[in-house]
Amino acid sequence: MISFIKGVLIEKDPTALLIDVNGIGYEVFVPMTTFYTLGDIDSQVSLYTHFIVREDAQQLYGFKSKVDKKVFQELIKVNGIGARTAIAILSGMDSKTLLHCIENKDYALLATVPGIGKKTAERLVVEIYDKLLKMANEIYAQTSGTTTTSQDSQAQQAPTSVVLANSIFNESVDALLALGYKQKDAEKMARSAMGDATTAAEVIRKALQGSIKSKR
């Protein structure tokens, strides 16, 4: 069981990283809420991990905090929710927002996540309600502050060129597709979130936040 990983960040794409640990490269899948906190390429990275072994694949999932890892582990115990859907949930909302959804039984907001319909949202609330409430203090403690990342610091750069803007748009769409959104929806979300964004991470964050706000 691999429960934690620390190494050098070699590659980073939305939802997937390559981390060098003593010369061995580990592919680690992460939610966008973890991706936003990452440093630059060649920087040190430390993640809490959950290792899943299947007949056709072995996959490692990483999280910025032990709390997020525990929330992920509770999510994948829910009938009908696999690792990909759990990652999509934690990409669209942080643990605190998810807790609010569970407390308020906000089925409509949960159903905005790709792969979750109304019935699955209702089942999720029923199966995870008590467990998540027991973690409330941990969840609120870790979300009391805001982490500044290298992605955030790039927000003050000059407006992007057309070529760079297209690259950011395409990368953002690819990330949203990886999270389970349909092509048409992914393009619409990315286009609406572009604005003066200078990184794909910024566009993805705004797109996912916009999806949540539109349902409130």
Curated annotation (Swiss-Prot):
SUPFAM superfamilies cross-referenced by the UniProt entry: DNA helicase RuvA subunit, C-terminal domain (SSF46929), Nucleic acid-binding proteins (SSF50249), RuvA domain 2-like (SSF47781)
Compartment annotation: Cytoplasm
Region (Domain III): 164-216
Renumbered residue ranges of the record's region Domain II: 65-143
Cellular component aspect of the GO annotation: cytoplasm; Holliday junction helicase complex; Holliday junction resolvase complex
Source domain of life: Bacteria
Keyword terms, alphabetized: Cytoplasm, DNA damage, DNA recombination, DNA repair, DNA-binding
One record GO biological process: DNA recombination
Start and end residues of each stretch annotated as Domain I: 1-64
Region of interest (Flexible linker), residue spans: 144-163
Swiss-Prot/TrEMBL domain comment: Has three domains with a flexible linker between the domains II and III and assumes an 'L' shape. Domain III is highly mobile and contacts RuvB.
Described purpose of this protein according to its UniProt entry: The RuvA-RuvB-RuvC complex processes Holliday junction (HJ) DNA during genetic recombination and DNA repair, while the RuvA-RuvB complex plays an important role in the rescue of blocked DNA replication forks via replication fork reversal (RFR). RuvA specifically binds to HJ cruciform DNA, conferring on it an open structure. The RuvB hexamer acts as an ATP-dependent pump, pulling dsDNA into and through the RuvAB complex. HJ branch migration allows RuvC to scan DNA until it finds its consensus sequence, where it cleaves and resolves the cruciform DNA.
Protein name per the record: Holliday junction branch migration complex subunit RuvA
Organism: Francisella tularensis subsp. tularensis (strain WY96-3418)
